[in-house]
Amino acid sequence: MRDIVFIERDPYAPIRHCYTVSKILYQGKSPYQEIQVIESPEFGRMLILDGVVQLDEKYEFLYHEYLAHVPLHAHPNPRNVLIIGGGDGGTLREVLKHDIVERAVLVDIDKEVIEVSKKYLPTLSVGFQDPRAIVVNEDGYKYVQDYENEFDVIIVDSTDPVGFAHVLTTEDFFRHVYKALKEDGIFVAQTESIHYHLEMVSNIQQRLKKVFPIVDLYTSVIPIYAGYWWTFSIASKKYPVRTPAREVKVQTKIYDADMHEYAFLPESFYNKIVNGEYKY
């Protein structure tokens, strides 16, 4: 009997990943995208949107812990958090590990992703059961425009910033985010691969610098993502972000106070990336 193999065809990176599939758990289509959940003997369950792997059970913590805990620990009092995207629930789960968080609003345009994750990805979707979680099925770009001085931290956990997610990387969106944040708010977004999307990373950093006084870049190594070396762009109205502002008490697999600082690129290397001086 031949193995079933899933070949990821990421249109935004010149690379192909192949995964052995032991079982196809779900396959369907929402009004916005194709949704699949497969079981891999090496990576556990995997969520695939429009043919691109979004996460795997084995290594998802390398993404969700960094996306959530760096901004939340950089802020001394993050009580109200907005997550745009993240319908799988992984970022919400990590945010709600912080007892100080009183409200976590998750806005994802695709209700089907949330429902599929609740059924097939229980280790990620546990946060939806928390009474502090509020789920809104709307366009995150439009949602954020309705708020001013509302959130302590805003996290964008989107698919690749192209297609309907492209607006979440524009200067216009960043200005709406700035307005929706409180006077000491912090913003973070996943911003793709240093290896294959270097120009995009640099452009997003430049746009953020037009809006926020403090802008920085940190990374994590994520085996299932193109190029492995993944970036997160972070912006702050007030607080420096390279060191935690609070004691790290949350239970994690890898994130801690040391890893928080290690995640940030050396400033000399960071400046080369932002200024477009770093070339392969």
UniProtKB/Swiss-Prot annotation:
| Location of the active site | 157
Q: Which UniProt keywords apply?
A: Cytoplasm, Polyamine biosynthesis, Spermidine biosynthesis, Transferase
Enumerate the GO terms in the molecular function aspect.
spermidine synthase activity
The cross-references to CDD domains, in alphabetical order and at most eight, read: AdoMet_MTases
Q: Which PROSITE patterns has this protein been placed in?
A: PABS_1, PABS_2
Localization per Swiss-Prot or TrEMBL: Cytoplasm
GO BP: spermidine biosynthetic process
Question: Where is spermidine bound in this sequence?
Answer: 64, 88, 157-160
Q: Which GO terms describe its cellular component?
A: cytosol
Pathway stated in the Swiss-Prot or TrEMBL entry? Amine and polyamine biosynthesis; spermidine biosynthesis; spermidine from putrescine: step 1/1
Origin, by domain of life?
Bacteria
Homology family: Belongs to the spermidine/spermine synthase family.
Assembly with partners or alone = Homodimer or homotetramer.
- Identify the NCBIfam families for this entry: MFS_SpdSyn (NF037959), PRK00811.1 (NF002010), speE (TIGR00417)
Q: What is this protein called?
A: Polyamine aminopropyltransferase 1
Question: What gene does this protein come from?
Answer: speE1
